[in-house]
Amino acid sequence: MTLLEFFRSILRRLGMIIFPSAFKTMSVSVKSSSAEVTVVETTGSLHTLESLKDEVMRLFRSPCTLRRMLSMSSALRIQYKAKLQESEACMLPSYCHALPNGRETGTYISLDVGGSTLRIALVELHGRESQNPMVIKHIASSKIDEHTRRLPGTEFFDWMAGKITDMLDQTKEAWPPQTTLPLGLAWSFPIEQTSHRGGKVQGMGKGFACAETTLGMDLGELIEAACARRNLNVRVDAIVNDSSATLLSQAYLDPATSMALILGTGTNAAAYLPTGCMSRSKFGARDQSWFDKADRVITNTEVSMFGKSILTETRWDELLNRQHQRPDFQPLEYMTTGRYLGELLRLIIIEAVETGELFGGVMPELLREGYSLDTEVMAKLEMDTTKTMQQSIAMIKKAFGLKKAPSLKEVKFLRTATESISYRASAYMAVAVHGLWALQKDTDINPTTPNGTPKTSIACNGSVILKYPGFKDRCEGFIRQMTDTASSPAGTFTAEKIVLEPTNEAAVFGAAVAVALADAP
């Protein structure tokens, strides 16, 4: 601590003793479009560490009552319905209008292209009743490094074709000579889909240069052409995004599956909805023959974009939003996902440091930059339930670059803040899921549940929902509370059970299932 920082800390403490009324927190109520009033706390004040801890708990946990969650779910359902009619950014129907019946079989190539990794797998589907319904016979993973991201135009697809060649060289026994190889693609970037097997390339972001000269070109044709240049007879039969792939992979195993949730660094959800509940303009220039077959369609909800003026915010949420490059763009994502949970804790730490009681009033050097606090730190804090918290003390000292170990009081403050942030995140995600489930019931998707089953299965994937301590169980518990109550917006469907089902290798299996559906008569 510098001499100046020391004197500032002393002055803060004196001010809190001499003029305590000047340091009281003020609260201002603002209107919300939901039935509840959103309370946004504002402060020009300094707290003790203990009073700030109590305030953090209150602000993050108070919206998580059953009554308020049901109110937010109802408001979200109204927002979902509106976007089914008008938005070009969310509630986007795919070309996949059928769910698997579990009898699809075959051998397929699955290609999973993400922001940092390319995975290629040889997948066998044996049928739902088989002992091993879905099997990965071979899988290869390649890092997409900075050099690869910068490959221009078709060179990136040539690189992909090279990796496909390498994998096929190791699995020649699976394919008779001269066979056309069916490929399913899980594509984690924007695409304007034009058919089940094709779509126009959009800007990819994340440092990828290939889209600059292939913008608007057909993605399936680009991959097939790159493979042809290597004398590979590959046919792209299906293109799906991550949420659709997750839904398909679980639906192959469980006929009660009609939704999927991705919750990791970001979030998204897919829902199986009636085509009739959407504006015809949503479907673009599709042939009437498609509509003749498509009573329902897997819909990319882009659920991260919902929740503005519905989900109750704290002053730290408002600060994060104001400082974001795209304020208000993804309200739900900013309050629930791996990228932002750590940043919310960092913003609370900044305020706690200002009390002079956290880290001696000095902001840790490693936390001065935005988004420098990894959500993994929060997960480790929540896992430490010991009285002395020695592991957490050592972990925080290292993670924050502190010169001396934090006190037990400081680490308990951090754990309380962490638990409050993740508690609300699981509640808000439950609210979003419950709203989508109620939307399915409203649109007559399955009033008696699929195939007469007594539950709705929601396929889940992503590091937060699957790996963050207690997150999935809490989220499922909140959903159960909302569906069990007689005041549920879904009304007559309150007896139904909603289960969050973890998925394994969802992108790889989902892409293969999508190909099998494309092959179906």
Language-model region placement:
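Conserved beta-strand elements of beta-rich interaction domains across eukaryotes
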Residues: G115-S116, L125-G127, S188-E192, S244-A245, ...
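A general secondary-structure junction signal
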Residues: L185-F189, N241-S243, N504
